[in-house]
Amino acid sequence: MSLKGKTLLVSTITLAAVVLVALLGGSVFLKAGQNVRKAFEEYELAVEALDKLGELETKVALFVNNAAKIEEVSSLFNELKKVADKIPSLKEHMDALERNISEIISGKTEVVSRIQSSVDQVKEDIMANLDRTRENLDKEISYSSELIRNVLFIVLPIVAVASGVFLFVMISRSLRLLKPVMEASRSLRNNDLTINIQEAKGKDEISTLLNEFKASIEYLRNNLKDVQTETFSVAESIEEISKANEEITNQLLGISKEMDNISTRIESISASVQETTAGSEEISSATKNIADSAQQAASFADQSTQLAKEAGDALKKVIEVTRMISNSAKDVERVVESFQKGAEEITSFVETINAIAEQTNLLALNAAIEAARAGEAGRGFAVVADEIRKLAEESQQASENVRRVVNEIRSIAEDAGKVSSEITARVEEGTKLADEADEKLNSIVGAVERINEMLQNIAAAIEEQTAAVDEITTAMTENAKNAEEITNSVKEVNARLQEISASTEEVTSRVQTIRENVQMLKEIVARYKI
């Protein structure tokens, strides 16, 4: 059986035991519950019977005293009979009660005492029956509790002990099977593959694991033997390849040295030719640069002359605009002065309005006082006087606002006047400087025109010299090309040799790496005991 099946078996047995205990306890509780329900029903019937007996006793007494009808007594007795069918102790007395009630109906009142004694006897029997039922119920509950307690304290421990023993046996066997695996793991950690594991004959997971582990160790041992054999063979081949590669490298080094000597001599010849060519090219280049510079200088001189003339025209326009700005600034000063005068006049008007408002306020106050003295006749005049006083106060407040605004405008006008004066001064100064600059630009234009004529003469002479230098440079360039072709051919051969040498060195490096890896592999394989 597999480990999973064994574990499932233990769980099933334990669960079955628990279910058995639960079913047993449930049946006991079910039986006890039925008894309790039956006792409770009997108790309810007894209580109902006692109530009916009490009511019957009361109705009989009322009937004897002509306070109740015979139908009520009969109806109540019939209800009591229905209850008595379910209570044996009450049913025994129903015939006697029925005879006594019949006699009372026929007019025999002395029977009432017998009915009362019968009812009391029935009540005593019912109460005695209830006591017996309660005692039986207590015994039933005690028995059920004792039975369940015995089951819980006897059956469950037995099941738990049995399950524990079974699990202990199963785990012990599993650990015994795993012991060779642990020993083999320690041997593998010590690089020892000579360990021999006995084959397990079980069919559970632990036995399967042990057999798979045994097969893995044997597979690893066989592979390591093959690796050892192949490693020694590869090491011998690497040594032979390394020796052959060293011989090729030495031959390539000798050829490379001879090619370096040839290349050095050709490079020396080429360098001399190149120096001569470079000198003539430098002369030609310098001559061309001088000619170009002279032509550029002449062109710049023409441009400078044109720009100077344009600058003179622009400067004249600036002078005219500056003078116009100066005139406008003076006009602004006049406007600002007129504005300040108008502000002073507005201030005077505001003060006059303010004085009138104060006088109006005083007159309105006096009118209000006189209206108050006049009583009812002056009430309307007092209202008008109060409105006039408010209007005077609003006028006074508005005049104050106007004065404040006028003061702000006057301050701004003063600032504008100062700025305008400063602009006028700066414009006059700029006009003087512009006049001086105009005179100097005229002088510069004349000087640049003279320089332009001299540069044109220099450019013509340099062009003739440049043509002669170009002829010398052409001849030297052809010699330099021939030397370069020879040098390039030698360099190409040398480059090919260098590539071959580099490839050989790379092969040597890789062979050395392989040699080191093989040596490391030999050391690793040698650690294992096979």
UniProtKB/Swiss-Prot annotation:
The modification Glutamate methyl ester (Glu) is found at E281, E505. InterPro entries: Chemotax_Me-accpt_rcpt, MCP_chemotaxis, MCPsignal_dom, T_SNARE_dom. It is a multi-pass membrane protein. The modification Deamidated glutamine is found at Q498. The keyword Transmembrane helix applies. It comes from the Bacteria. It is found in: Cell membrane. GO terms for molecular function: transmembrane signaling receptor activity. The modification Glutamate methyl ester (Gln) is found at Q274. The chain crosses the membrane at residues 9-29, 151-171. GO terms for biological process: chemotaxis; signal transduction. Residues 152-222 form the HAMP domain. Residues 244-480 form the Methyl-accepting transducer domain. GO terms for cellular component: plasma membrane. Keywords: Cell membrane, Chemotaxis, Membrane, Methylation, Transducer, Transmembrane, Transmembrane helix. Belongs to the methyl-accepting chemotaxis (MCP) protein family. Chemotactic-signal transducers respond to changes in the concentration of attractants and repellents in the environment, transduce a signal from the outside to the inside of the cell, and facilitate sensory adaptation through the variation of the level of methylation. This is Methyl-accepting chemotaxis protein 2. It comes from Thermotoga maritima (strain ATCC 43589 / DSM 3109 / JCM 10099 / NBRC 100826 / MSB8). The lineage of its organism: Bacteria, Thermotogati, Thermotogota, Thermotogae, Thermotogales.
